[in-house]
């Protein structure tokens, strides 16, 4: 059996320990490595000719990407998970206890257990390459660093910086890592090994004191000050997580106890807390999302089809969506883009939008001005169909007008090649209707982005009956290159995301008209786990946009999609939301720093906010509508699987990740329980709450999605 760790000795007394997991593109730490590492460390200790040790990766662009997450699923009990953490502690403590200098030479991803391995070394040097990132992202999986990270990181970079890294899971770039004292040096990759060897030859050095602000020096230097840091961190965490995620509080406790009672006690607490989190329902849900997205990356979206390479893209429309799509195509996919708009103003807006996003990177020193300018050079513009003939894909982002989109299809078929894909960014019009104008309907597909494009990770790839498998596969690959998570959905009004969102939003509107206040509604759903409440979301998306989509959904899908008529009064009062500074909340000069409701909205709607219902009951009424419709979408074949439905809801509308998505959450609730809740609401409020057939069948059979 091939080994993962190989020790080679140099003539100068420095040994190189190379980690290279056989048959894998990236290094990950596995439980079975423990004995192998211990054996090598024993060999090093017994060889007096070894004066120093350099730990390096044999992989091209990865140091260690973290622990193998599948190990956690093998843990049947908290005791199994605790043993896993303790095994890591034993190995890393052995490494740290070596009397010779140990240097980690880092190039590429150094994350999670990989960074904990590097922290157990006496010094660290990393490459200045863009692929090099350091971090402890375990919190994003509902976990904490279980290999000593909660103890070694605060001692190296300070409590405040360490908590920030562990509570956010952020990735640190090389220069930032040097500045914060996480690494001792940053060098070009070409001299990484040489530098690490020189550091090992120079011997162990006491770590440089971390540069801290005066406030942090004072706070971290006394037990009273440290308590202030921990208390503030706890308050911020509670506000952000609404008590829905247990990991952050446990991370704070590990650091607090380790600093107060010593490293040994800290490691004991870390192992116990890690074990509790591994078997928590929140971490299981978050890990299911991780596995789902990893699995989806291997799929083409159309079985048996291979994607064609996209060498050039055209974007029709220079508005917010068009500008955003053009921007991610050049900056993330590195694909040349031609933006076409009928007005010079639209084109200059698209260029300005892309420049502004790139310039943020320059200001944060994430890229050089030259790199920004090179990426901007990939974007060109035209008011006519010039320079579009060789486009492999055309993304249409014009107004939601069927006649206009028909004209775009005809123009593109006339101006471009026979293989050119026409992808419409429509949010509501059926793709089959857009394809009616095409002589090559197999090339027509939907590609629905969410706003703002550069931030929202999801895209819906919408296939109509005649879309070819190659068109689907090429569009999915194109979206992935843009840094997006694509889900393939079938054609139908609202597709998947807007369809499940519409009923949720409509129910929130009904509750508002029944007398629930705007703040109470929003707070109830944020407490449930959504990033923003439904009324805030309506203001952000645009009340006018909601008003355009609702009739389309009602016409195609039936009475249950009928929006409350009272909302027409908002448009009559010129309330569109944030975009025109007039909606449910105050904007502009009249708004205070804390978001305040525009109380005049109640008068416009002809209601008085009365006694607020229990927040859980408010959230339940909105959420069960979304759950029921998600199952209906599966029933109708709009989505291919519960997995796709979970990913679409989490990445498209911020469904609470700790619940795992609508389908995982239904499994947690139980189909029979959900049917009972829906039928109770149906008896009170009518047939919009009628459970779909699949749910009823599942309730009878006590079935699950996963």
Curated annotation (Swiss-Prot):
Its main location: cytoplasm. Keywords: Cytoplasm, Fatty acid metabolism, Isomerase, Lipid degradation, Lipid metabolism, Lyase, Multifunctional enzyme, NAD, Oxidoreductase. It catalyses: a (3S)-3-hydroxyacyl-CoA = a (2E)-enoyl-CoA + H2O; a 4-saturated-(3S)-3-hydroxyacyl-CoA = a (3E)-enoyl-CoA + H2O; a (3S)-3-hydroxyacyl-CoA + NAD(+) = a 3-oxoacyl-CoA + NADH + H(+); (3S)-3-hydroxybutanoyl-CoA = (3R)-3-hydroxybutanoyl-CoA. Residues 1-188 are annotated as: Enoyl-CoA hydratase. Signal peptide: none annotated. Residues 308-706 are annotated as: 3-hydroxyacyl-CoA dehydrogenase. Catalyzes the formation of a hydroxyacyl-CoA by addition of water on enoyl-CoA. Also exhibits 3-hydroxyacyl-CoA epimerase and 3-hydroxyacyl-CoA dehydrogenase activities. Heterotetramer of two alpha chains (FadJ) and two beta chains (FadI). This is Fatty acid oxidation complex subunit alpha. It comes from Shewanella baltica (strain OS185). The lineage of its organism: Bacteria, Pseudomonadati, Pseudomonadota, Gammaproteobacteria, Alteromonadales.
């Amino acid at each position: 059996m091939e080994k993962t760790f190989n020790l080679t000795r140099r003539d100068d007394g420095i040994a190189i320990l190379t980690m290279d997991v056989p048959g894998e593109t990236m290094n990950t730490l596995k439980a079975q490595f423990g004995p192998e590492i211990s054996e090598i460390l024993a060999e090093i200790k017994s060889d007096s000719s070894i004066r120093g040790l350099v730990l390096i990766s044999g992989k091209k662009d990865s140091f260690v990407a973290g622990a193998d997450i599948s190990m956690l699923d093998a843990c049947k009990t908290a005791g199994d998970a605790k043993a896993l953490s303790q095994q890591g502690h034993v190995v890393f403590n052995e490494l740290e206890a070596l009397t010779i200098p140990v240097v980690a030479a880092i190039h590429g991803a150094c994350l999670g257990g990989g960074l904990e391995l590097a922290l157990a070394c006496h010094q660290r040097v990393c490459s200045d390459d863009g692929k090099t990132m350091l971090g402890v992202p375990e919190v994003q999986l509902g976990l904490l660093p279980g290999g000593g990270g909660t103890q070694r990181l605060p001692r190296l970079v300070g409590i405040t910086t360490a908590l920030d890294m562990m509570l956010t899971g952020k990735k640190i770039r090389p220069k930032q890592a040097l500045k914060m004292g996480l690494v001792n040096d940053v060098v070009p990759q070409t001299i990484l090994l040489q530098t690490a060897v020189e550091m090992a030859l120079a011997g162990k050095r006491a770590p440089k004191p971390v540069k801290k602000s005066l406030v942090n020096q004072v706070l971290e230097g006394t037990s009273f000050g440290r308590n202030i840091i921990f208390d503030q961190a706890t308050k911020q965490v509670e506000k952000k997580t609404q008590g829905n995620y247990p990991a952050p509080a446990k991370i704070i406790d590990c650091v607090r106890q380790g600093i107060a009672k010593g490293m040994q006690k800290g490691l004991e607490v870390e192992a116990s807390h890690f074990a509790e989190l591994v078997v928590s329902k929140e971490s299981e849900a978050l890990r299911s999302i991780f596995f789902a997205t990893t699995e989806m990356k291997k799929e083409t979206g159309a079985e048996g089809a291979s994607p064609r390479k996209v060498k050039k893209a055209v974007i029709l429309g220079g508005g917010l969506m068009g500008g955003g799509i053009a921007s991610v195509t050049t900056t993330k996919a590195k694909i040349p883009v031609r933006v076409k708009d009928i007005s010079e103003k639209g084109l200059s807006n698209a260029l300005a939008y892309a420049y502004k996003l790139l310039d943020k990177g320059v200001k944060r020193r994430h890229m050089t001005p030259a790199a920004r300018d090179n990426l901007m050079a990939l974007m060109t513009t035209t008011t006519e169909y010039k320079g579009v003939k060789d486009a492999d894909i055309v993304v249409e982002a014009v107004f939601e007008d069927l006649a206009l989109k028909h004209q775009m299809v005809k123009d593109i078929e006339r101006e471009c090649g026979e293989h050119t894909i026409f992808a419409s960014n429509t949010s509501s019009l059926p793709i089959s209707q857009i394809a009616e104008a095409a002589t090559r309907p197999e090339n027509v597909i939907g590609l629905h982005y969410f706003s703002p494009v550069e931030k929202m990770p999801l895209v819906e790839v919408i296939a109509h009956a005649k879309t070819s498998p190659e068109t689907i596969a090429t569009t999915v690959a194109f979206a992935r290159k843009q840094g997006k998570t694509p889900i393939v959905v079938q054609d139908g009004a609202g597709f998947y995301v807007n369809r499940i969102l519409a009923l949720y939003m409509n129910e929130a509107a009904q509750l508002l008209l029944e007398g629930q206040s705007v703040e109470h509604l929003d707070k109830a759903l944020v407490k449930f786990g959504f990033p923003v409440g439904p009324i805030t979301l309506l203001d952000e998306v645009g009340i006018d946009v909601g008003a355009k989509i609702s009739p389309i959904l009602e016409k195609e899908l039936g009475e249950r999609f009928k929006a409350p008529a009272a909302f027409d009064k908002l448009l009559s009062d010129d309330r569109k939301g944030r975009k025109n500074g007039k909606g449910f909340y105050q904007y502009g000069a009249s708004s205070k720093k804390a978001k305040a409701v525009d109380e005049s909205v109640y008068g416009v709607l002809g209601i008085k906010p009365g006694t607020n219902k229990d927040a859980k009951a408010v959230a339940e009424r909105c959420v069960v509508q979304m759950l029921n419709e998600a199952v209906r979408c599966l029933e109708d074949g709009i989505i291919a699987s519960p997995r796709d439905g979970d990913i679409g809801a989490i990445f498209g509308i911020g469904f609470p990740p700790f619940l795992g998505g609508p389908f995982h959450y239904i499994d947690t609730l139980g189909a029979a329980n959900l049917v009972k809740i829906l039928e109770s609401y149906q008896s009170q409020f009518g047939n919009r709450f009628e459970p779909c057939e699949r749910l009823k069948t599942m309730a009878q059979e006590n079935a699950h999605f996963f």
